[in-house]
A protein has these predicted regions:
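Membrane-anchoring alpha-helices and their flanking helix-loop junctions
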Residues: 1-88, 104-169
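Membrane-interface loop-to-helix entry segments
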Residues: 91-105
Length: 169
């Protein structure tokens, strides 16, 4: 019989659908912008060639680090365990929401490669909703784990990996 993954906290029931809609919209807009750039010639090839090398390195870093965060956070959270366990090691020791941050970094990396104002607006909306969802989950984790999670919040930043700001009180 397959083992069922046991969760400590809860997730908003519509969150998966919201993510699918936003990420799909982002991808469609990016693809449409690429087609329209080829069709209408804006921005010029010269502008793209001159800016591309400058933006390539941060884009690759954002995408690679984002993939790393998502991969490692999934491995930690979805590891088969007999009882649910609070994970505060690995990527969870540097940021409280590595899955969300990883996804945001991947999309931001693609924005560096091919900027689209509409896709940027979608990214901002996605960030705001990720922050809302993270806060929703944290309230539940505080209820379930109490002081253990409150201590974790004081040690580990919510979003900014290298930030000294740990949590809102």
């Amino acid at each position: 019989m397959p083992e069922k993954h046991v969760r400590l906290g809860s997730e908003h029931p519509l969150w998966d659908r919201i993510q699918i809609v936003l990420i799909s919209s982002f991808i469609v807009v990016m693809l449409f912008d690429n087609v329209s750039t080829l069709s209408f010639g804006y921005p010029s090839i010269l502008e793209r060639v001159s800016a591309y090398p400058i933006l390539l390195l941060p884009a690759v870093f954002l995408i690679a680090f984002g993939v790393y965060l998502v991969k490692e956070s999934h491995a930690a959270v979805f590891a088969k365990t007999v009882e649910p366990k609070f994970v505060d090691s690995g990527v969870y020791s540097i940021v409280r929401h590595p899955m969300y941050l990883g996804g945001l970094m991947i999309l931001l990396g693609f924005l560096f490669l091919k900027f689209s104002l509409i896709a940027f607006v979608i990214w901002v909306v996605y960030f705001v909703l990720c922050d809302w969802m993270a806060s929703y989950e944290e309230k539940d984790l505080l209820r379930v784990l109490g002081k253990e999670y409150a201590d974790y919040q004081s040690r580990v930043p919510k979003w900014l990996v290298f930030s000294k700001v740990r949590t809102r009180k």
